[in-house]
UniProtKB/Swiss-Prot annotation:
It comes from the Bacteria. Pathway: Glycan biosynthesis; glycogen biosynthesis. This is Glucose-1-phosphate adenylyltransferase. It comes from Rhodopirellula baltica (strain DSM 10527 / NCIMB 13988 / SH1). Belongs to the bacterial/plant glucose-1-phosphate adenylyltransferase family. Keywords: ATP-binding, Carbohydrate metabolism, Glycogen biosynthesis, Glycogen metabolism, Nucleotide-binding, Nucleotidyltransferase, Transferase. The gene is glgC.
Amino acid sequence: MQPEHVAGANMPNAVGNHDPMMRQTVTVILAGGRGSRLEPLTRDRAKPAVPIGGAYRIIDFVLSNCLNSDMRRLLLLTQYKAQSLDRHINVAWRNYFCRELGEFIDVVPPQQRIDDNWYQGTADAVYQNIYAIEREAPEYVVILAGDHLYKMNYESMVNFHHRKGADVTVGALRVSREEARQFGVMQVDTDNRLVEFQEKPENPRPTLDDPDVCLASMGIYVFNTRFLFERLCDDATQPDSDHDFGKNIIPGAIEDSQVFAFPFTDENRKRDAYWRDVGTLEAYYEANMDLVGVDPQLNLYDRQWPIRSFQPQLPPPKFVFGSEGRSSRRGEALDSIVCQGAIISGGCVRRSVIGTGCRINSYAQVEDSILFDDVNVGRHSRIRRAIIDKGVQIPPETEIGYDLALDRARGLTVTDSGLVVIARGEMIASPVSTNGSHDPTSSLTS
């Protein structure tokens, strides 16, 4: 299955091309995911609002793709603990869209316009917002997931959909057979027409050209608007339906409609295509650690396909205290990302992501870790393989990630791989008791 080359598909920074077809398109972004496997990071925020790479949120990648693809009519469907996401959209994204030119990014919580239920599935979420789509009178509706990391030109997919005369087009990604069990798996003919679709099969069928590779659905769809409305309205009347695009809408459409697969066109400009579902703590951690490498797989430095976000009005990061004689008091960070407003004040940072406003105090060590905004690490503390949420205060002389049994006893989240996670609002008692000695029983309380 080979991607078709279309005019403008590889043009640098497609913003401003103003393809008339994109003006006939409304984009619906599903951003209400609970992200339960990312707990406790999603205890107070939806999965798309989880920070990534220090300066971004997960949602910024799909929104940047939209803007770079000249898609400027966006409906963002939220549901679960959306306040953090709502605030981020307001401060980071509103100014990119001009209402006077018919552009918008609207955050749409469940309206209960049709019945008293919350969203019951991906298809039901769109069904409950047919009114919001219909009033814009689009010819095409693009449906995206708001919780994946990748760089893609959606304009190419819409043009492909139009040329094929498709009713629906599904974004397709080549994955290993082992990975394919977590996806919807497709079979296509020589014209990229879907002939079979299985949702998360136990024994996925490989592609015809490679017995070790499967064609997986990316959860990205282009629909003809009228066709979409008809299928959603019919699905809503089916009591045994899961009201899900992968389980119900797409398999049903294959039987009697023009359904095509569009091969993922990567804008990452690296040797290997990049697409990640950071739905587990380990996957999330590895995606961040990739970014601090010498040559990251995810390219954040490509000015032709920028990833945008909110940039706070803070001073640049600062590193203070150099070695004085034999003292180990030296503010430094190597193989790391350090964001605005952070101060490395005599501490040492290695292979870590340091968020805005963090402070690493004298003689502290942070290794292989992710610190969200405004984390304060006390003197002589040591942190290894940890994810620390926003605003957490680490007392002096505290060790995190060195004694996993102690970390569990404190009430911290410790994964099977030994990754330690401290949630926002949790406090760590000082390891130094009132008489100045180390207290091994100090614990964490909310």
